[in-house]
Amino acid sequence: VKRPMNAFMVWSQNERRKIMDQWPDMHNAEISKRLGRRWQLLQDSERYPLSRRRSVRLKHMADYPNYKYRP
């Protein structure tokens, strides 16, 4: 079972699609660098709405009630 996505991962999914639509030939490594820089510039309130973060976590907890992270 995978860990629930953190705020950056959820945010970057949507942003990655936008970048790929504009620049379909851009390498994934370059996209990741751009996303990282943009993420660092965002205010905490812009990064990811608290309600969405909670819903992702709550869904994961409901789907996997006995889940325990083990590295």
Curated annotation (Swiss-Prot):
Database matches in InterPro entries: HMG_box_dom, HMG_box_dom_sf, SRY-related_HMG-box_TF-like
Organism: Eublepharis macularius
Membrane-spanning parts: none
Record key words, sorted: DNA-binding, Nucleus
DNA-binding region, residue intervals: 1-68
Listed name of the protein: SRY-related protein LG27
Gene Ontology MF terms in the entry: DNA-binding transcription activator activity, RNA polymerase II-specific; RNA polymerase II cis-regulatory region sequence-specific DNA binding
GO CC, any one term: nucleus
Localization (cell): Nucleus
Record keyword DNA-binding present: yes
